[in-house]
């Protein structure tokens, strides 16, 4: 931090948005204007420093979240640049989990787009205060005021306008600063490094006065002193106004909205000022709640203090070809020095910290110490995975784990040779450690290795990384939909596993109540055994059996989700019972339940947003209906129609080609996972045949 231990001069922020809204371009300008780098890296040239992977530079998109640190106005800003493509939403999720604030970037032409809504909801989930930056104001069709309306209508947010654009499209030259009531214009020959303050253009003065009055009216509600002064007709000073805005942002009462054009080098410095002035420091964030490692029911409060015991959360693991495994952590309290030993409370094991590294994308800087509020990477950890808590050995605490989305697509991969088989095992173990949304399993019938991920692009990148980084040559099957199964009725099952073949036998009796749960609940296991009907050392065998057997399905071999299993009674034999016997009994109970609990097949439903010229709307809607889709909403959008529909993922293969064909290449779409729904009876047979 700028002054050691001063948490108030630190900001941990993320840059988030829909793909192509300009997140990485904005981040590159931030790094240039703060002096972190002496040149501007352009995404379209494959030269953005934050997009360091080969695949990112080739495709011009961000795939993995990248961290860096810069300074502005004597404040340390730790920045995480996140992906905008829906297939890499896990990178946004785990970044927001450890950030104190965020900058949401919007395309000034497109406004609020599908992934904008997704990342906004993710930020809501973790109560992350944010400010908005309406980018690309130099583009033809950019509409700042329409974008503000969309932030209100589509995101349910309360926008607080702090700037107005000066000029439209190519004539965009700067902004009106409503807090200071002045204009800011940029000098193009300095790449935007130089800017000038001036008078507000006369044609914007009336609008500026109107918006400033609205700004003050909303802001003073955050401070009694300011409210009384306002009601008495007094002048609200700039420092008092900024203090009110800051309180409202931290309290999630509203979101400040600024504008500019990162690519044209306009608007970035005031955005940095807003980050420092309005987003919270680690000391502004409420205390973190954890649980005792020895007693999960006992709550533990962690304060953002350098002087308290060390507590941190591991939010990302990556493999560096030079230093091996790197574990990214956010420190919530205390300090950590190199060569320390810490407790991984999630694993119940100690870890030796080798080096502490400050990261700039994939570049590393050794540092001797980190403390509360810092984000850094640790080298040398062996057992830590994403979501684990690291803490002082004398303060065993567990922070809340992260939730990761269900995979919706899968592919089969087969190594070309025996040598590739060995390399593939190593590659996949490392990639799974890095990416919690990637799942790997082996098909019990075909013996094929199955990769499960968030979409076609996600899996395509994984296969490409196996080849480039690990030298694995593999044949890849066509993408398949990741169907699921669930139950619709409760069923109470009594099952006895008994086997006697001479010598030691096997005996286990279980009574399990199976119940359906709401969508998205996953699997829950509850032990209600009383009076020692089943010894406690056998209970894990029951849970393990259910965890294993639910992956084999009931109808078509797909994993079973959204149900609860309650073990409420049973029996054991002093000699013949064992954990294995109870595991087998649980599996038998599950298979018997499948015939009584109304099993059904589930399919992933995608939210699809299509922008099409009016003349093709009829064809597009007809095509949506033919794919078993449901049109949920239609809106006017810049001489076109925005159609929101929900369509089964299994019906979306090849859609990009079909949409281009029916619209002569003028329509476009984006989609992301919405939920799992029951497959209609008339479509079940088709799924079973696949």
Curated annotation (Swiss-Prot):
Top-level taxon of the source organism: Bacteria
One Gene Ontology molecular-function label: GTP binding
Xref: InterPro entries: EF-G-like_DII (IPR053905), EFG_II (IPR041095), EFG_III (IPR009022), EFG_III/V (IPR035647), EFG_IV (IPR047872), EFG_V (IPR035649), EFG_V-like (IPR000640), G_TR_CS (IPR031157)
Principal subcellular localization: cytoplasm
Keywords on record: Cytoplasm, Elongation factor, GTP-binding, Nucleotide-binding, Protein biosynthesis
The keyword RNA-binding belongs to this UniProt entry's keyword annotation: no
Listed CDD domains: EF-G, EFG_III, EFG_mtEFG1_IV, EFG_mtEFG_C, EFG_mtEFG_II
Residue positions binding GTP: 17-24, 81-85, 135-138
One BP annotation, GO: ribosome disassembly
Subcellular location: Cytoplasm
Residue ranges of every copy of the tr-type G domain listed in the record: 8-283
Pfam families: EF-G_D2, EFG_C, EFG_III, EFG_IV, GTP_EFTU
GO annotation, cellular component aspect: cytoplasm
Coiled coil ranges: none
Family note: Belongs to the TRAFAC class translation factor GTPase superfamily. Classic translation factor GTPase family. EF-G/EF-2 subfamily.
Function summary: Catalyzes the GTP-dependent ribosomal translocation step during translation elongation. During this step, the ribosome changes from the pre-translocational (PRE) to the post-translocational (POST) state as the newly formed A-site-bound peptidyl-tRNA and P-site-bound deacylated tRNA move to the P and E sites, respectively. Catalyzes the coordinated movement of the two tRNA molecules, the mRNA and conformational changes in the ribosome.
Name of the molecule in the record: Elongation factor G
Organism: Anaplasma marginale (strain Florida)
Gene symbol of the encoding locus: fusA
């Amino acid at each position: 931090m700028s002054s050691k231990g001063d948490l108030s001069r630190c900001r941990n922020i993320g840059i988030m948005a829909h793909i192509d809204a300009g997140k990485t371009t904005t981040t590159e300008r931030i790094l240039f204007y703060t002096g972190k780098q002496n040149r501007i890296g352009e995404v379209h040239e494959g030269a953005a420093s934050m997009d360091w992977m080969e695949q990112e530079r080739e495709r011009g998109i961000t795939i993995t979240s990248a961290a860096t640190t810069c300074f502005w106005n004597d404040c340390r800003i730790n920045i995480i640049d996140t992906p905008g493509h829906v297939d890499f939403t896990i990178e946004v999720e785990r970044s927001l989990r450890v950030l104190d604030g965020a900058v949401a970037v919007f395309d000034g032409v497109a406004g609020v787009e599908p992934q904008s809504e997704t990342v906004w909801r993710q930020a809501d989930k973790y109560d992350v205060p944010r400010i908005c930056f309406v980018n690309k104001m130099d583009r033809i069709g950019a509409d700042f005021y329409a974008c503000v309306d969309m932030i209100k209508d589509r995101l349910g947010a309360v926008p607080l306008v702090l700037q107005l654009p000066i000029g439209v499209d190519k004539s965009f030259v700067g902004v009106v600063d409503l807090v200071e009531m002045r204009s800011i214009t940029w000098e193009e020959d300095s790449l935007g490094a130089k800017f000038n303050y001036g008078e507000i253009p006369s044609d914007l003065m009336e609008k500026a006065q109107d918006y400033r009055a609205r700004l003050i009216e909303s802001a003073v509600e955050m401070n009694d002193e300011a409210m009384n002064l306002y009601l008495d007709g007094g002048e609200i000073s700039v420092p008092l106004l900024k203090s009110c805005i800051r309180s409202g942002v931290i309290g999630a009462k509203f979101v400040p909205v600024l504008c500019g054009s990162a690519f044209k080098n306009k608007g970035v410095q005031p955005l940095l000022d807003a980050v420092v002035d309005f987003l919270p420091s680690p000391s502004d964030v409420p205390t973190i709640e954890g649980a005792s490692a020895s007693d999960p029911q006992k709550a533990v409060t962690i304060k953002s203090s350098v002087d308290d015991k060390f507590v941190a959360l591991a939010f990302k693991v990556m493999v560096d070809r030079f230093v091996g495994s790197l574990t990214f952590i956010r420190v919530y309290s205390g300090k950590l020095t190199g060569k320390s030993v810490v407790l991984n409370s999630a694993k119940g094991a100690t870890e030796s910290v080798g080096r502490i590294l400050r990261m700039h994308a994939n570049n590393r800087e050794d540092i001797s110490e980190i403390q509360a509020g810092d984000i850094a990477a640790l080298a040398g950890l062996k057992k830590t995975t994403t979501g684990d808590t690291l803490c002082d050995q004398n303060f065993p605490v567990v922070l809340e784990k992260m939730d990761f989305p269900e995979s919706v697509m899968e592919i089969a991969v087969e190594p070309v040779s025996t040598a590739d088989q060995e390399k593939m095992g190593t590659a996949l173990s490392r990639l799974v450690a890095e990416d919690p949304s990637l799942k790997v399993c082996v098909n019990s019938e075909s013996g094929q290795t199955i990769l499960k991920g968030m979409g076609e692009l996600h899996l395509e990148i994984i296969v490409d990384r196996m080849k480039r980084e690990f030298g694995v040559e593999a044949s890849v099957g066509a993408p398949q939909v990741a169907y699921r199964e669930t139950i619709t009725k409760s069923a109470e099952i009594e099952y006895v596993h008994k086997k006697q073949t001479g010598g030691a036998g096997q005996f286990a009796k279980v009574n399990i109540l199976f119940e359906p749960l709401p969508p998205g609940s996953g699997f829950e296991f509850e032990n209600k055994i009383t009076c020692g009907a089943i010894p406690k050392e056998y209970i894990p065998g029951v849970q393990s059996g259910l965890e294993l057997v639910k992956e084999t399905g009931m109808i078509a071999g797909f994993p079973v989700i959204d149900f609860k299993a309650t073990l409420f009674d049973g029996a054991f034999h002093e000699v013949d019972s064992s954990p294995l016997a109870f595991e087998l009994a649980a599996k038998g109970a599950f298979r018997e339940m499948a015939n009584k609990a109304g099993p059904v097949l589930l399919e992933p439903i995608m939210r699809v947003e299509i922008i099409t010229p009016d003349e093709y709307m009829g064809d597009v809607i007809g095509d949506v209906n033919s794919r078993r889709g449901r049109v949920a909403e239609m809106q006017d959008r810049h001489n076109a129609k925005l159609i929101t529909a929900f369509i089964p993922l299994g019906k979306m293969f090849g859609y990009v080609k079909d949409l281009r064909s029916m619209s002569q290449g003028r329509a476009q779409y984006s989609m992301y996972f919405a939920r799992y729904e029951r497959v209609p009876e008339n479509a079940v047979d088709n799924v079973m045949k696949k």
